[in-house]
């Protein structure tokens, strides 16, 4: 009998966000691209979220897949993003990727920076 430990996804990568990433990758014409989500110092609350496309997964990266799209998180950023939800919204304020982070004790008004 084989026993495997199923680990829950470290974060939620919504179908809507994955669909938008897939659309952007198709526009770029490079099916090797993956979306990297990362945390950097800065912003009005101390840390800020960043998004970029990357062709390479680095040692220690966490990979989350949805709809044929891969999301990458480096080990340092991972600790701040566990349990978060990556989504994409379109509204009167414009269209943007949104991170709903249960680890953030405070966030700024724009939602792009936080403090753990």
UniProtKB/Swiss-Prot annotation:
Cofactor note: Binds 1 iron-sulfur cluster per subunit.
Sites where the protein binds iron-sulfur cluster: 44, 108, 110
Keyword tags: Iron, Iron-sulfur, Metal-binding
Pfam families with a match to the protein in the record: Fe-S_biosyn
Functional summary from the UniProt entry: Required for insertion of 4Fe-4S clusters for at least IspG.
Subunit note: Homodimer.
This protein's name: Iron-sulfur cluster insertion protein ErpA
Natural source organism: Nitrosococcus oceani (strain ATCC 19707 / BCRC 17464 / JCM 30415 / NCIMB 11848 / C-107)
